Swiss-Prot record:
E.C. designation(s): 3.4.21.88
Subunit comment: Homodimer.
Cross-referenced NCBIfam families: lexA
Residues marked Cleavage (site): 110-111
Name the record gives this protein: LexA repressor
Molecular function terms from GO: DNA binding; serine-type endopeptidase activity
Family: Belongs to the peptidase S24 family.
Keywords noted in UniProt: Autocatalytic cleavage, DNA damage, DNA repair, DNA replication, DNA-binding, Hydrolase, Repressor, SOS response, Transcription, Transcription regulation
SUPFAM superfamilies from the UniProt entry: LexA/Signal peptidase, Winged helix' DNA-binding domain
Name of the gene this protein is made from: lexA
Known function: Represses a number of genes involved in the response to DNA damage (SOS response), including recA and lexA. In the presence of single-stranded DNA, RecA interacts with LexA causing an autocatalytic cleavage which disrupts the DNA-binding part of LexA, leading to derepression of the SOS regulon and eventually DNA repair.
Annotated organism of origin: Anaeromyxobacter dehalogenans (strain 2CP-1 / ATCC BAA-258)
Reaction catalyzed: Hydrolysis of Ala-|-Gly bond in repressor LexA
Length: 228
């Protein structure tokens, strides 16, 4: 395995920290702004080098599909637990940390839509710093593999911020035909597209005239994996 330059290590460390803090990778523009890399081409050069050296897996057509490999986790001192998730079961709490309890209200499909049961099945305690300023957050357990391109795997928990609106391209939990599903949402003229990140899966389309804001149950602000 080839070694990393100081700059490549900075880029890799920033990607891993953003995934841990927010549950998803940064965009190329966010990397450039954070590390003072003036052009997107410059960022892309570093990403290509990280991919070529085996430290990063990426999809060139998706701005956030940046997943550190096991070699990256070793280089960053993360072992085998994975940098793209934050385990629900952690070691001792950070000094001065504040733990909050998140309700797990059911399950949601990352595949064919299924009904998310609106009752509290369990709760998990998470360090408050992981959720930042997000309030009114609830958890859902994921079934299906249509969001694996975003690092959301079957059995993971998604933490969802309750809101009835979303920006173009955000990962949302949506209620479609009385069934809940997790997808990226895109507003495209006369229709709304709910897009999986697994290339084997087809998107779900809703005509703009049929779309209601109440279809959006919330925006995914993190993905968490329970370690055994």
């Amino acid at each position: 395995m080839e070694g990393l330059t100081d700059r490549q290590l900075e880029v890799l460390r920033f990607i891993a920290s953003q995934i841990e803090d927010h549950g998803y990778p940064p965009t190329i523009r966010e990397i450039g702004e954070a590390l003072d890399i003036r052009s997107t081409n410059g960022v892309n050069d570093h990403l290509k080098a990280l991919e070529r050296k085996g430290y990063l897996s990426r999809d060139p057509v998706k701005s956030r599909a940046l997943i550190p490999t096991s070699a990256a986790r070793e280089a960053l001192g993360g072992g085998e637990t994975g940098s793209n998730v934050v385990p629900l079961v952690r070691g001792p709490a950070r000094p001065g940390s504040r733990m909050i309890e998140i309700p797990i209200v059911g399950r949601v499909a990352a595949g064919m839509p299924i009904l998310a049961q609106e009752r509290v099945e369990d709760t998990v305690q998470v360090d408050a710093f992981l959720l930042g300023t997000n309030k009114k957050v609830y958890g859902l357990r994921v079934q299906g593999d249509s969001m694996i391109g975003d690092g959301i795997l079957p059995g993971d928990y998604v933490f969802v911020k309750k809101q009835l609106n979303a920006d173009d391209g955000e990962i949302v939990v949506a209620m479609i035909d009385d069934e809940a599903t997790v997808k990226r949402v895109y507003f495209e003229g006369d229709r709304v597209r709910f897009q999986p990140s697994n290339p084997r899966m087809a998107p779900i389309y809703v005509r703009h005239s049929d779309f209601r804001s109440t279809m959006i149950l919330g925006v995914v602000v993190g993905v968490y994996r329970k370690l055994t």
